[in-house]
């Protein structure tokens, strides 16, 4: 499979993917047309049940070991014959990853879970000092409704399973998302110090954010990803955007992705916890409890955290039928008059939502482009 990506002078590359007979990604060759067609090759090897045994990017090689429950036990990164990093992993009786110890740096990252096996706290210990870097709270449906990163609190409010808007520790609304009918976040408003900034998401075919564009057409931030979603953000990122790889919520403080049912570690290509969905008997690749998208992250995404979903060709952002556009943002992005617009307005109320110190009712607007 071959894909080509081109974004002015920023990205101009071609990727060629190779798979084994089980459909698992085993090689990616990237040709950078900006640098005299220089190529970079990354290869992956797996065991019979789908555990990644080795990743080789031409510069470093990372090897992995597992226990009998397919739980990751060690990862060793080598450059030539020199060992650069060794990590050791531990799990609790429920199959939740609880500790990641870097034996070279002495840093230990600890995960704590609630009674429903949901990640509730992440802390880091180094040189005998422990710091809590993240705390999470969930509602009865299992959705994360609050995240505390250091001294910054974010409260999440959902529409049909997708984050519609957020508030800060004082209940002040600081964002409002524009959501498509397929649950795709198309644009967003950010409220900061009595000012409003509008942003439009540019996304690739996987639904991953490639750039966040301001009203003047300039990019607030650009995003690049490895095959399994390791994320590099360049730019100011004034919007503090979290919607990144395949539309998942990226927690920069932990390096993890919140994919609703579970948290995903793109560096290892695995989830931290077992999947409560045990897969289908006639589809063995769905029965692994930890691996991401059956080791085929190019053609599949996992928005629920429960299993791979095939990518629909042609599912890119555009003025197509059925997209949801908020009135204010639609006008700001000069969509008025582009298509016949039918307004379908719904109202609903949430508790203590405030903007600029004033309590207000949340109004959910849905505008369908026909």
Residue spans for each PLM region:
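Beta-strand elements of repeat-based all-beta scaffolds
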Residues: 1-18, 24-37, 41-56, 61-65, ...
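A short acidic/small-residue loop/turn micro-motif
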Residues: 9, 32-35, 60-61, 78-81, ...
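Polybasic, low-complexity binding patches
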Residues: 277, 301-310
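A motif-centric feature for acidic-aromatic and gly/ser/thr-rich catalytic loops and repeats
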Residues: 48, 54, 58, 62-64, ...
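A cytosolic small-molecule/anion-sensing beta-strand core signal
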Residues: 93, 115, 140, 205, ...
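Hydrophobic, gly/ala-rich membrane-insertion helices/peptides used by toxins and envelope proteins
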Residues: 306-370
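Exposed loop/turn and edge beta-strand positions of beta-sandwich/beta-sheet ligand-binding modules
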Residues: 13, 38-40, 60, 85, ...
């Amino acid at each position: 499979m071959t894909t080509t990506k081109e974004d002015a002078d920023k990205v101009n590359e071609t990727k060629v993917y190779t798979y084994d007979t089980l459909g698992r990604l085993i090689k990616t060759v990237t040709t950078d047309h900006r640098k005299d067609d220089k190529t970079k090759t990354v290869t992956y090897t797996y065991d019979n049940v789908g555990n990644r045994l080795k990743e080789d990017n031409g510069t470093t090689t990372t090897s992995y070991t597992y226990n009998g429950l397919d739980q990751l036990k060690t990862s060793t990164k080598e450059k030539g014959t020199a060992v650069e990093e060794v990590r050791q992993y531990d799990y609790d009786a429920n199959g939740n990853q609880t500790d990641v110890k870097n034996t070279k740096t002495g840093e230990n990252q600890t995960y704590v879970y609630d009674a429903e096996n949901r990640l509730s706290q992440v802390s880091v210990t180094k040189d005998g000092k422990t710091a809590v870097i993240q705390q999470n709270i969930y509602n009865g449906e299992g959705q994360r409704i609050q995240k505390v990163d250091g001294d910054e609190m974010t409260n999440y409010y959902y529409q049909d399973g997708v984050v519609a808007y957020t508030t800060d520790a004082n209940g002040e609304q600081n964002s409002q998302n524009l959501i498509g009918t397929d649950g795709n976040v198309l644009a967003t408003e950010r409220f900061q110090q009595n000012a409003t900034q509008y942003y439009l998401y540019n996304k690739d075919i996987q639904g991953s954010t490639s750039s966040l564009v301001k009203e003047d057409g300039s990019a607030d931030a650009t995003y690049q990803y490895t095959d399994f979603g390791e994320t590099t953000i360049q730019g100011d990122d004034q919007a503090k955007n979290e919607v990144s790889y395949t539309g998942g919520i990226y927690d920069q403080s932990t390096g993890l992705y919140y994919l609703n049912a579970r948290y995903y570690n793109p560096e290892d290509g695995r989830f931290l916890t077992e999947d409560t969905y045990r897969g289908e008997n006639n589809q063995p690749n769905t029965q692994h409890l930890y691996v991401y998208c059956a080791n085929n992250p190019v053609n599949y995404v996992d928005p629920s955290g429960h299993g791979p979903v095939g990518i629909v060709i042609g599912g890119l952002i555009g003025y197509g039928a059925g997209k949801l556009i908020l009135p204010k943002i639609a006008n700001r992005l000069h969509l008025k008059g582009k298509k016949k617009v039918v307004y379908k307005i719904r109202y609903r109320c949430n508790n203590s939502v405030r903007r600029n110190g004033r309590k207000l009712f949340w109004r959910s607007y849905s505008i369908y482009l026909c």
